[in-house]
Amino acid sequence: MYLDINWEEDSIPENERGSLTGLLEQGIAKAVHLSAESEEAEVSLTLVDDARIHELNRDYRGVDRPTDVLSFALQEERSDEPDILDYEDHLLGDIIISVERARAQAIDYGHSFERELVYLAVHGTLHLLGYDHMEEEDKEEMRRQEEAVMSQIGLLR
């Protein structure tokens, strides 16, 4: 598992980044292993502020507001592929997370910032693997996968 983290958002002190990096690596690696049954994957994770994710959300999705997480898969699922993607080259894509949204949501949901940040990374990884939550059945499956990963790494609600 290779995770490249870009710390564009400077509200996370240098001395906290090491422990967060470990948790993020665990979460993403577990999501890949559970969903794609692989230990090998490459993901780029960028932590940004609300202004930057708002810009990206507007430019790439046509939604003119900030969001918590965006995922950009390097390979898109085609109609002749299985529902859950399995990449031979292991390059999954990019995940962008708003640190401001993660902090606010952690407060709203009554759990730690670390848990929320890792949850968003897991959520983004599952999108890279082909999961979605547009239909209720798909949403339930995605939530099961998210909770399984979070439970395995001990970051429960």
Curated annotation (Swiss-Prot):
GO biological process, one term: rRNA processing
Species per Swiss-Prot/TrEMBL record: Desulfitobacterium hafniense (strain DSM 10664 / DCB-2)
PANTHER family: ENDORIBONUCLEASE YBEY, CHLOROPLASTIC
UniProt keywords, alphabetically: Cytoplasm, Endonuclease, Hydrolase, Metal-binding, Nuclease, Ribosome biogenesis, rRNA processing, Zinc
Subcellular location: Cytoplasm
Species classification: Bacteria, Bacillati, Bacillota, Clostridia, Eubacteriales
Keyword Methyltransferase carried by entry: no
Protein family membership: Belongs to the endoribonuclease YbeY family.
Amino-acid positions noted as binding Zn(2+) in the UniProt annotation, renumbered to this chain: 123, 127, 133
Molecular function terms, GO-annotated: metalloendopeptidase activity; RNA endonuclease activity; zinc ion binding
Cofactor: Zn(2+)
Protein name: Endoribonuclease YbeY
Keyword flag Nuclease: yes
Enzyme class: hydrolase
GO cellular component: cytoplasm
EC number(s) on file: 3.1.-.-
Function: Single strand-specific metallo-endoribonuclease involved in late-stage 70S ribosome quality control and in maturation of the 3' terminus of the 16S rRNA.
Pfam families according to UniProt: YbeY
Cofactor: record remark: Binds 1 zinc ion.
